[in-house]
Swiss-Prot record:
Belongs to the ALG6/ALG8 glucosyltransferase family. This is Probable dolichyl pyrophosphate Man9GlcNAc2 alpha-1,3-glucosyltransferase. Its main location: endoplasmic reticulum. The chain crosses the membrane at residues 42-64, 149-169, 184-204, 214-234, 264-284, 360-380, 422-442, 463-483, 491-511.
Length: 533
């Protein structure tokens, strides 16, 4: 039987969790569930989060009523049309009924399978919405309603359970914590304003790949490494942008394997889990090298250039002074961006290979995804969802920095959301996040105890710089909405917004990389050296 530690009466919300002699035992998780009331908190917050998502769906989506190609909504609908009417081998192949220049599939097979399942659902209730060829640009009320419901259901059945899995494991490893702290953390994850606006406003299914990633992260924390490999392989098979997290998973798992009696066997076991998962879900395309390469070519549209539109990363921001596209060929830019991304990811990877820990792994996820966002090839505004998800999971460790990152992550997508006519949801969710973030609880005290190594606040002028940044951002909000830019510089305000957001992101990246290297090794049982077979 697990031994319960004596309760400490430091506050009515503080609870001491019994420690199971076996890591990952269901005993301590069940005790935690029944004594902390997490189920009630999670259900209440989940219902509220679904209500907010439903409210956002009432607003326009990407490309609404704008022919000939409309936007991401039409892309997702078109993929349902293709997958429900054509053989699986033709889903990625250009042909009479599948014109790849009109929203051809450019995500891995799991996205195609998801489109097929959702397409069957749409065809049952509204066959016209997925009829081959004739359904292009379909925007009936029922069709839009069904499409919105597919995103809501994906969120509810994939992202929400994954979030609960993570919260259970994460707070079980934290030997003390209050109900309000746990509820606040759940709210920060489920009421992620960036994800809500992109999936339920703009219209995408990021909740699926991010949900699988969160599940894989939770599996790491409870030391289920094979499950980690399976879930993360599924995330990669749904959206290739999940590769933003790959350096963190690779370095952490490799670091743990190297500390065991049989490191090679450990690596082989995990490698088999990855290979089997990929083979199963890529099965229709692994029989022929040509078919396999055909799918891969759709996943890497290098011809679009190193960046698209205005994104707050290094390449777009510096292009104001350095015309990258004019100075270098696409092939050269691919090599340069790859080298820059590897160099930016390397410090956090080395730290986890040398000293793998649960907390270091969470920081590694944040640092590798931010490195990809800042320096990789063909980054979109929506790609900020990757590092922002990692920061959300670390919200209790970085409460102040997390609030600032949320603001600038939202602001970096402001022009995109305005084009989609999502200004009201943008302002409403920003306000809602601020209210919930400042809700009663003890989360602000966490920073003093858990992240005490280094802070920008120790630098003279930091507070002034932060306030100046914020003031400029408010001015840019107003200018963007009220003043027409000069004809000579039609995207002036977008460029200024990107410069401002990039300047914050790069400071944040330096801070989190430094913090990862100065972590103590008290978080979780996996931080201790173990010799396993």
């Amino acid at each position: 039987m697990p031994k319960k530690k004596p309760a400490k009466h430091s506050g009515e919300d503080d609870i001491t969790i019994p420690v199971s002699p076996q890591t990952g035992s269901s005993i301590d998780t069940w005790w935690w569930l029944t004594h902390k009331g997490t189920t009630t908190s999670f259900l209440c917050i989940s219902l509220f989060a679904l209500l907010i998502r439903s409210a956002v769906t009432m607003y326009p989506y990407s490309g609404a009523g704008i022919p000939p190609k409309f936007g991401d909504f039409e892309a997702q609908r078109h993929w349902m049309e293709i997958t429900t009417n054509l053989p699986v081998i033709d889903w990625y192949r250009n042909g009479t009924y599948n014109d790849l220049t009109y929203w051809g599939l450019d995500y891995p097979p799991l996205t195609a399978y998801q489109s097929y399942i959702h397409g069957i659902f749409l065809r049952f209730f509204n066959p016209e919405s997925v009829a081959l060829l004739s359904s292009r640009g379909h925007e009936s009320y029922l069709g839009k309603l069904l499409m919105r419901w597919t995103v809501l259901s994906s969120d509810a059945f994939i992202f929400f359970p994954a979030a609960l899995f993570f919260v259970l494991v994460y707070h079980r490893n934290r030997t003390r914590g209050g109900k309000s702290e746990v509820a606040w953390h759940i709210a920060m994850i489920l009421l992620n304003p960036c994800l809500i606006l992109i999936d339920h406003g703009h219209f995408q299914y990021n909740c699926i790949s991010l949900g699988l990633t969160v599940g894989a992260i939770a599996a790491v924390l409870c030391e289920s490494e094979v499950l980690t490999c399976v879930l993360f392989s599924l995330a990669l098979s749904h959206k290739q942008m999940s590769a933003y997290f790959a350096p963190a998973f690779f370095s952490h798992l490799l670091g743990k394997c190297l500390r065991r009696k049989s490191p090679i066997l450990s690596v082989i076991k995990l490698g088999i889990a990855v290979i089997v998962t990929f083979v199963i879900f890529w099965w229709p395309y692994v029989h022929s090298l040509d078919d396999f390469l055909m799918v891969l070519s759709r996943l890497a549209p290098f011809e679009r250039g190193i960046y698209e539109d205005y994104v707050a990363n290094f390449w777009c921001t510096t292009s104001i002074l350095i015309k990258w596209k004019n100075l270098f060929t696409t092939q050269s830019l691919k090599s340069i961006s790859l080298a820059a991304t590897i160099l930016a990811s390397l410090p956090s990877m080395v730290q986890q290979i040398l000293s793998p820990s649960n907390e270091g792994f969470l920081y590694g996820l944040l640092n590798s995804s931010m490195a990809f966002y800042l320096f990789s090839f063909q980054v979109h505004e929506k790609s900020i969802l990757m590092p922002f998800l990692s920061a959300t999971l670390l919200a209790l460790k970085l409460p102040d920095h997390f609030s600032h990152l949320t603001y600038y992550a939202l602001f970096s997508m402001f022009p995109l959301l305005c084009r989609d006519k999502l200004l009201i949801p943008y302002l409403t969710l920003s306000f809602l996040f601020t209210v919930i973030y400042h809700s009663p609880g003890n989360h602000h005290a966490i920073q003093k105890t858990d992240v005490s190594f280094f802070s920008f606040k120790n630098f003279p002028g930091y507070v002034f710089l932060l306030r100046t940044h914020f003031f400029i951002s408010v001015v840019l909000h107003v200018l963007y909405l009220t003043i027409k830019p000069p004809q000579k510089y039609p995207f002036l305000f977008e460029a200024l917004i990107m410069i401002l957001c990039f300047s914050y992101f790069i400071m944040f990246a330096f801070y989190t990389n430094y913090t990862q290297w100065t972590l103590s090794s008290h978080f979780g049982s996996s931080d201790k050296e173990k010799k396993q077979i």
